[in-house]
Design a protein with these regions (language model features):
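Extracellular, cysteine-rich, disulfide-stabilized repeat modules with beta-strand cores
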Residues: 33-51, 58-66
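Short, solvent-exposed secondary-structure boundary motifs
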Residues: 24-29, 49-54, 300, 503-504
Length: 554
């Protein structure tokens, strides 16, 4: 499966937006101000900013000063937002429990609505706060005021009772919003996404199925808020045999959305979706909330849409997915895709067999060590990097694909800790570039998995020191950090939250917080017998390049 857009986190080392305005009309206000990354403060510009004003209540920093918090989040184009779309994968565990983890990233209670096929659903009866850890987790209804500040709730979106052998229903003690139909699109067709609306800025992940260790088909992704969507993408899926059925989804947030795709392979027609020829642009039209769901041949080679260029007239969300991802015991464990011709790559430490050059849409898979740094020549040569792990049987997959402007020109690659083929199913997860690391995260680990591993990366601070990192279940700072390569800029460590079905010290599966005064990246891995999920716990998802790759060459 795939995991993957952003957490309840902050990045105090790197303010996200600069606006020139006068605070509250004061004549002595600084000429230039900027917003803190968490949007709670107005700061002076420069490398050592000071707080000019704190935005309280439902206000956040944005153009002109303290404005509505959701408007501030929209203006920041960060991973924190108030509007998301979610889709479950087209997997053989039809109708299983589809849920979203909604983290309240603000200082006031949050209400949540779901919108599906034009109908708005108050999510309060279907939102529950997990209590406890491990197998003792219970689900508490949210307060009448909403999800508390700094907390998270699981919103149970969909389930449809099924006789499928690996069907996993939602916990018996909770209520589910949609129970009369499976919201997942089936086969190449026009479908419908579920919109998630929050009253204050949030970070949202989805997981399918929730509690899915016994399904052998889990999938999770970190969602991007719609203001962080874009009009230009390079598609990434994965071709595997014997029954991968790789696919791609496009989701619209506006009526009249036109999506032009330059496919790398032929596309077979489906319900409402026209056929297309490789290397010939094709355009699809959908309206708000609709999806173009393209699933490819079930087996063989030449069925992978990776490298296809996508451009739209309005911002869209793009997902890569797989019906049944399979993988041999000794696969390449890294996937890199180029966005610009003439891209050159350097590695620290050197990685035998890794590509040193890339062109537009080129996919290269390679094996590499547990930790390395890879970088292109500059930020006008961004590229995509994903981590992959093998596993028994097959696994469903879906991930929201980062748009081209959010791709980095450098990454720190940390492999999954487990090398046991029988532990976990095949899994792929986006690697977040250090330019989008945060300083704190709130995240939830599924209690039905016997193994949970946190892969952490920290960045040397401007004062040439590494800052302590604290996890809520560990007394004192995390220890055991190892250097990545020889540059001295990055360190990494693996932290087990659960191992072989047992707690690790005071740590166990459930709700967690982690923080530092320096920049920190975190990938959550959960795995069990023939089942895996993974997602980045967060990312700033701000635009970090100005590259545009048109599907119709100029």
């Amino acid at each position: 499966m795939m995991g993957d857009a952003a957490d309840g986190g902050t990045n105090t080392n790197d303010a996200t937006e600069e606006y020139v305005f006068s605070v509250d009309g004061a004549n002595d206000a600084p000429a230039c101000t900027q917003c803190s990354a968490d949007l709670h403060s107005i700061l002076t510009c420069g490398s050592n900013p000071t707080v000019v004003q704190t935005c309280t209540g439902d206000l956040g920093c944005g153009p002109g000063g303290c404005i509505d918090a959701c408007d501030a989040a929209n203006a920041s184009q960060s991973s924190i937002g108030c509007d998301y779309y979610s889709i479950p994968p087209d997997a053989w565990t039809h109708g299983s429990c589809f849920a979203a983890y909604v983290t309240n990233n603000w200082s006031s209670p949050m209400t949540v609505n779901l919108v599906w096929k034009g109908t708005t659903i108050n999510a309060a009866p279907y939102a529950f706060i997990p209590q406890g850890t491990g197998t003792s987790i219970t689900y508490q209804a949210i307060p009448t005021s909403g999800i508390p500040a700094g907390s998270m709730a699981i919103v149970f979106i969909n389930q449809l009772a099924s006789s499928d052998v690996y069907y996993v229903g939602c916990p018996a003690s909770v209520k589910t919003a949609i129970t009369t139909v499976d919201v997942a699109a089936k086969g190449t067709s026009i479908g419908d996404a579920v919109e998630i609306q929050t009253s204050v800025p949030a970070v949202v992940y989805d997981i399918y199925p929730y509690g899915g260790a016994t399904s052998y088909m889990p999938s999770a992704t970190l969602l991007l808020p719609t203001p962080a969507w874009n009009t230009n993408f390079i598609a990434t899926t994965m071709s595997e045999t014997p029954a991968a059925t790789p696919g791609i989804d496009f989701v619209a947030q506006q009526d009249g959305t036109m999506i032009t795709l330059l496919p790398t392979i032929d596309i077979t027609a489906g319900t409402g979706v026209a056929a297309a020829t490789a290397n010939t642009p094709v355009t699809y039209s959908i309206n708000k909330g609709q999806t173009v769901h393209i699933m490819q041949a079930a087996s063989g080679t030449g069925v992978d849409l990776t490298g296809s260029i996508v451009q739209s007239n309005y911002p869209i969300g793009v997902w890569g997915e797989h019906y049944c991802l399979t993988q041999s015991a000794s696969p390449p464990n890294w996937r890199v895709v180029g966005a610009v011709k003439g891209t050159t790559l350097t590695y620290d430490p050197p990685v035998s067999g890794a590509p040193t050059t890339l062109t537009v849409g080129q996919l290269v898979e390679f094996a590499g060590p547990g930790a390395f740094h890879v970088q292109s020549q500059d930020n006008m040569h961004p590229f995509y990097l994903a981590a992959h792990r093998p596993g028994g049987d097959c696994d469903a997959a879906h991930q929201e694909i980062p748009p081209i402007p959010t791709l980095g020109n450098e990454y720190v690659a940390i492999a999954n800790e487990s090398a046991d083929y029988d532990l976990g199913g095949p899994e792929t997860v986006n690697v977040v570039p250090p330019a989008q690391f945060l300083t704190s995260y709130i995240f939830f680990t599924d209690p039905t998995y016997g193994y949970t591993d946190l892969a952490l990366v920290r960045v040397m601070a401007p004062d040439n020191t590494f800052k302590d990192v604290t996890l809520d279940c560990i007394t004192g700072p995390i220890t055991g950090w190892q250097p990545v390569g020889t540059s001295g800029k990055y360190e990494y460590v693996h932290v087990d939250v659960q191992h072989a079905g047992a707690a690790v010290g005071a740590c166990n599966n459930g709700l967690h917080t982690i923080s530092s005064t320096g920049l920190l990246g975190i990938t959550v891995w959960g795995y069990d017998s023939a089942a895996s999920y993974a997602y980045p716990a967060g990312a700033s998802v701000k635009p970090i390049n100005t590259v545009v790759v048109p599907p119709i060459p100029n």
